[in-house]
Amino acid sequence: MDKKYAAARLLPPIDASYQPARSVTKIPATSSLEEILEVLERDGGVILTDFVPKETMDKIDEELEPYTKTIPDSDSYDDFIGKKTLVIAGLISKSDTLANILDTNETIDKLLKIILEERYPAVFEGHTEELVIDPLLSISMAFHVGQGSPRQALHRDDMVFSSKHHPNMKINEVDGFSCFIAGSNVTRENGGTMVILGSHKWEHDRRGRPDEVSFLEMERGSAFIFLSTMAHGAGYNTIPGEIRKIMNLVFCRGTLRQEENQFLCNPRSKVLKMSPKMQTLLGFKKPAGTWLGMVDNDDPAKDLPAIYEKIMQ
């Protein structure tokens, strides 16, 4: 990365006197899909309270504990995260409990189908077929944000896909969405993510401004679902000795390249034990009727053990 951009990606905190005009909407995780979609359509993001029970969060903490010993001291993501934030990558292979949440959560499953599932007509000489391409898990990672970790420049996550935006984009036109799960209480003071409500419907070239942001504040176990078109950025943690913990599951369309190489970051022993649904999310299954992801002209998910055996020779 050109070093002239490094300083522009990590910034000082927003003045403490600034007060947002709006707060991020919170609704129970048990809310209907219609209620969740209504807020997503309007604001671009919504907090779902009590998304993960306390006992389950405790189990995730226990599973991730071995990976928290590394002292963050490198410029992760080309100076886009900062030296005082620990990043735990490949999260679903490090926490079976989190992987199970992804495998079994009906809300995430329904949102994936509505927002990111591709259904389109394929036109042949004498007929037309409807093809379906399943969404993918783009990346799974945890952030442990320490005191003094700077705020990120406001940005949109779908920039990694070279996505283009236009005013009033429909929810099923976006290229991705994220699910933040709070591993600790999240406040403005400990660096709660800055979000600009409504920015998911901006024109492509509009830049977010600090005087437009609201702050993500939620309790441990809550989740924040937001579209990849929403302008946001990590906040500045000002509290000595306090770590803000966020687990991030990012999803994308099945026609896009995943941000994290799921084929290499998930151990074979883990993948072979996963459900067909999880293998599909990672990209190991060829979408029915299409030709994406073939191995030897066939669907690798038909016999993954044999495929692994062959490539390990």
UniProtKB/Swiss-Prot annotation:
It comes from Arthroderma benhamiae (strain ATCC MYA-4681 / CBS 112371) (Trichophyton mentagrophytes). Aminotransferase; part of the gene cluster that mediates the biosynthesis of swainsonine (SW), a cytotoxic fungal alkaloid and a potential cancer therapy drug. Swainsonine production occurs via a multibranched pathway and is dispensable for fungal colonization of plants and infection of insect hosts. The first step of swainsonine biosynthesis is the production of the precursor pipecolic acid (PA) via conversion of L-lysine (Lys) to 1-piperideine-6-carboxylate (P6C) by the aminotransferase swnA, the latter being further reduced to PA by the reductase swnR. Fe cation binds at H155, D157, H232. This is Dioxygenase swnH2. Its cofactor is Fe cation. The lineage of its organism: Eukaryota, Fungi, Dikarya, Ascomycota, Pezizomycotina. The gene is swnH2. It is an enzyme of class 1 (oxidoreductase). Pfam families: PhyH. Pathway: Mycotoxin biosynthesis. Homodimer.
